[in-house]
Curated annotation (Swiss-Prot):
GO molecular function: dihydroorotate dehydrogenase (fumarate) activity
EC number per UniProt: 1.3.98.1
Family recorded in the similarity comment: Belongs to the dihydroorotate dehydrogenase family. Type 1 subfamily.
Pfam families, A to Z: DHO_dh (PF01180)
PROSITE patterns in the cross-refs: DHODEHASE_2 (PS00912)
Organism: Lactobacillus johnsonii (strain CNCM I-12250 / La1 / NCC 533)
HAMAP family linked: DHO_dh_type1 (MF_00224)
Protein name per Swiss-Prot or TrEMBL: Dihydroorotate dehydrogenase A (fumarate)
Residues binding substrate: K46, N70, S71, V72, G73, L74, N130, N195, T196
Subunit structure and binding partners: Homodimer.
Transmembrane regions listed in the UniProt entry: none
A GO-annotated cellular component: cytoplasm
Subcellular location(s) per record: Cytoplasm
Amino acid sequence: MINTHVKLPGLDLKNPIMPASGTFGFGDVPAAKKFNLNDLGAMVIKTTTPHSTTGNPQPQIAVLNTGVLNSVGLTNPGVDAVIKDKLTPLRSEYPNLPIMASVGGEDEAGYLEVAKKLSDSGLVNALEINVSCPNVNQGGMSFGVHPDVVEELTKKIKSLVKIPIYVKLTPNVTDITQIAKAAENGGADGLSLINTLLGMEIDVETRKPVLGHNIGGLSGEAVKPIAIRMVHQVRESTTLPIIGMGGISSAKDVIEFILAGANAVAVGTAHFKDSLASKHIADDLPKELEKLGITDINQLVNKVNFN
């Protein structure tokens, strides 16, 4: 029997697979209705802000040969509507599924409001603090590139909420370990990494960027080596649990992230090619572990053999 069970603060995962925030919306998008979400370790909902946001100008998504460039911009109906109209029915449908809510805001007060309301709702098991979204003009990555800001925000959120918090790190920094340490110093219970890399694609005929927002976040297979490297670097700098993400499309990719130091993973862009990607990866994981002679996935955490 292969053990894929992973226990993290607030998240008791039957397997280490979850959808990256935004991938399955609030559990209400078509892809999330194609299978039982209980087949995954957890559900991560789309980033929630204090008030409704409409996102960035269209087009918001460009599919590239090696990934996806997006500038969606945290579209959501606002925290009160999310709790009432999204999380309440999701929790009713999945009473035992670990749910992580992603927290966003334009300023510190916004982050604190959303975090407290989501925590007090009793509907989620943990919070992911999104200080790394590159597609908003205020908040998001503007918070996540400054260690002192990350530490202070983490500390204030931690003092307000009753559930574990995971800080989502941006790769758009010189040294991601400084941000990781700042989150740890602020009291974070875990880390999520990486968010998307800033990128741009230009249509040579119109001479215009392909995205309405001009610049977007790059995800998918092109970023996987960067994500693996950063997970390793962060693992070397902290003992906090890590949820790794960035270009995962197979069970082998999951194992690679675990070897680099992640405890669990999130799957995002792979769903553009296969709407059931996370389920297929979860189903394949025990088979891949068996091939390697591994009986417990936790045995592989940070077990890369360096040259």
